């Protein structure tokens, strides 16, 4: 994917109406310290488009990034931050649920899991909830550069078994630092958001 233009086009808060976008969307969800903003920046070849922070739980809105006037990458609020109040967690949950139910252009949901650790209870809850909503989440195993190459397959297996993923579920090991996994991730995204003839043209 050649990134020609990227714009943070819409930011939705608790009371905002979900936009009726003209292009297909893919959404990214993950625990608040999983590296979602860094992954989006690496994916889009931008250093600080999605704001990163040492403080978990920074993303508290749904952010719509228009890419090449052809698709939207949607950054959902991070979940599972311990210092977030119960009322705030409930609001974020309703906001995400509203988006999943309301968006007419959502084609796929990606769930980010830290490849270094077993999936948390919140990760499992989010995965099961997405499946219940009718999606088959694609898993992005982040922070790939933090483990040895010899550990990759073992850790991916731990994620697969920990989430009890559906057969055939795609798991993409990804590093925001080295951008390993970026091309594979774009191939998966393109398969959902681009017309078939355009995808075939890019493969030539």
Predicted regions and their residues:
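Conserved nucleotide-binding/hydrolysis micro-motifs of P-loop NTPases
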Residues: 58, 71, 78-81, 116-118, ...
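Helical mechanochemical/support elements of P-loop NTPase systems and associated helical scaffolds
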Residues: 22, 48, 61, 88, ...
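Conserved nucleotide-sensing/catalytic segment adjacent to the nucleotide-binding pocket
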Residues: 68-106
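Hydrophobic aliphatic residues
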Residues: 43-47, 100, 163, 189
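Conserved C-terminal guanine-recognition region of P-loop GTPase G domains, centered on the G4
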Residues: 97-169
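Canonical P-loop GTPase G-domain recognition
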Residues: 3-15, 146-204
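Conserved G1/Walker A P-loop phosphate-binding module
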Residues: 1-83, 194, 199-204
């Amino acid at each position: 994917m050649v990134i020609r233009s990227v714009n943070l086009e819409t930011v939705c808060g608790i009371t905002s109406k979900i936009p009726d976008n003209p292009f297909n969307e893919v959404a990214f969800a993950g625990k608040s310290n999983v590296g979602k903003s860094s992954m989006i920046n690496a994916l889009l070849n931008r250093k600080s488009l999605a704001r990163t922070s040492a403080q978990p739980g920074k993303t508290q809105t749904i952010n719509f990034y228009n890419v090449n006037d052809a698709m939207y990458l949607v950054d959902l609020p991070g979940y599972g931050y311990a210092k977030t109040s119960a009322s705030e967690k409930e609001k974020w949950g309703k906001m995400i649920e509203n988006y999943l139910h309301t968006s007419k252009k959502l084609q796929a949901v990606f769930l980010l899991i830290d490849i270094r650790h077993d999936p948390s209870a919140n990760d499992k809850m989010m995965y099961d909830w997405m499946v219940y909503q009718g999606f088959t989440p694609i898993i992005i195993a982040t922070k790939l550069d933090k483990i040895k190459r010899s550990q990759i397959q073992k850790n991916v297996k731990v994620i697969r078994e920990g989430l009890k993923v559906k057969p055939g579920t795609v798991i993409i090991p990804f590093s925001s630092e080295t951008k390993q996994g970026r091309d594979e991730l774009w191939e998966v995204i393109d398969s959902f958001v681009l017309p078939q003839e355009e995808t075939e043209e890019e493969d030539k």
